[in-house]
């Protein structure tokens, strides 16, 4: 009986703690500059989540630098009380941990709260290119080894990884096509438009308007067809189901050792956000696909992403 009473008291205490949190504003660290995908996604979360957080404000703070590592470390070292949280991205928790051997944190040193959204990727060519499908692109690369090129935003970026992984899945080597590195995702799209390169893979929001205008031709999209460009096949439909692993994403994480009641409160908040029209509309407007998951599912997803990019970094020989 004493054991049962103790267990009930513990449950009651946890429930009370969950209801009592938060009792003050929450700082939401965005580890990238204002105006980018991470910033917009974080602010959409903040403005819509606070109504389910005892009306306590979520205050976005941009701590950019070192490809997201500075802001990420800030949260890694924060007090585990639930009042400093992180907008985690594919760069901070998959690519950087795989790429940087001396990175000061590991991807799994955080409390996972929820995956938030997926950000589709599109592989594409110029609108007037003779290549009309992924299979035709593979044939063109194979027939002209070392002569075709693709645009990336840098060696360790998801744009580079996406094109390299596509060639790997097609049975090509990294030398079959040449990567040309630009300064950002916007320049990647522009490079294809200007015929500086033959193809690229990039975040959907910068590509969709050009596809709709006919100036770019999308070969496939990950992870599924998009309503904005419904005639563009998914990667699986184009014959490359493995490319569905190449997708941008956002998650909410906290420092290691967050109390269980804080994790449970956020699980409840995300269940409400999943039905919240304001969050849904903001997410769709920013080109995201809602992907709310449990903490355990989020950890499994992030682990799979890290393992994928760890393999790619090793294959490309670019680990630093």
Language-model regions: role of each:
Residues 207-275, 304-307:
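C-terminal lobe and pocket-closing loops
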Residues 13-17:
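N-terminal signal peptide c-region/cleavage motif recognized by signal peptidases
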Residues 77-84, 90, 98-188, 235-237, ...:
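Hinge/capping helix and adjacent helix->loop/strand transition within the periplasmic-binding protein
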Residues 18-109, 147, 171-201, 210, ...:
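N-terminal (or domain-start) structured segment
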Residues 23-25, 212, 237, 260-320:
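An extracytoplasmic/periplasmic, membrane-proximal ligand-sensing/linker region
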């Amino acid at each position: 009986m004493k054991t049962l009473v103790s267990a009930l008291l513990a449950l009651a205490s946890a429930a009370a703690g969950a209801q009592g949190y938060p009792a003050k504003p929450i700082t939401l660290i965005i580890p990238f500059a204002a105006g980018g995908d991470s910033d917009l996604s974080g602010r959409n979360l903040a403005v819509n989540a606070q109504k389910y957080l005892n009306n306590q404000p979520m205050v976005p703070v941009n701590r950019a630098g070192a490809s997201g590592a500075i802001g990420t470390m800030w949260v890694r070292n924060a007090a585990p009380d639930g009042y400093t949280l992180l907008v985690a991205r594919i760069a901070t928790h998959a690519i950087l941990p795989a790429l940087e051997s001396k990175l000061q944190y590991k991807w799994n040193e955080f409390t996972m709260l929820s995956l938030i959204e997926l950000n589709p990727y599109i592989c594409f060519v110029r609108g007037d290119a003779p290549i009309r499908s992924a299979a035709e692109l593979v044939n063109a690369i194979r027939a002209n080894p070392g002569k075709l090129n693709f645009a990336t935003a840098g060696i360790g970026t998801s744009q580079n990884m996406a094109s390299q992984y596509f060639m790997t899945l097609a049975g090509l080597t990294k030398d079959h096509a040449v990567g040309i590195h630009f300064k950002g995702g916007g320049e990647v799209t522009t490079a294809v438009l200007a015929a500086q390169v033959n193809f690229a893979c990039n975040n959907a929001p910068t590509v969709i308007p050009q596809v709709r205008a006919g100036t770019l031709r999308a070969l496939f999209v990950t992870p599924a067809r998009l309503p904005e460009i419904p005639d563009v096949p998914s990667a699986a439909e184009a014959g490359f189901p493995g490319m569905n692993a190449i997708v941008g994403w956002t998650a909410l994480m906290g420092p290691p050792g967050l109390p269980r009641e804080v994790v449970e409160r956020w699980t409840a908040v995300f269940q409400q956000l999943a039905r919240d029209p304001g969050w849904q509309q903001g997410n769709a407007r920013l080109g995201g696909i809602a992907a709310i998951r449990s903490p355990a599912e989020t950890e499994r997803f992030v682990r799979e992403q890290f393992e994928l990019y760890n393999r790619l970094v090793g294959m490309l020989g670019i680990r630093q």
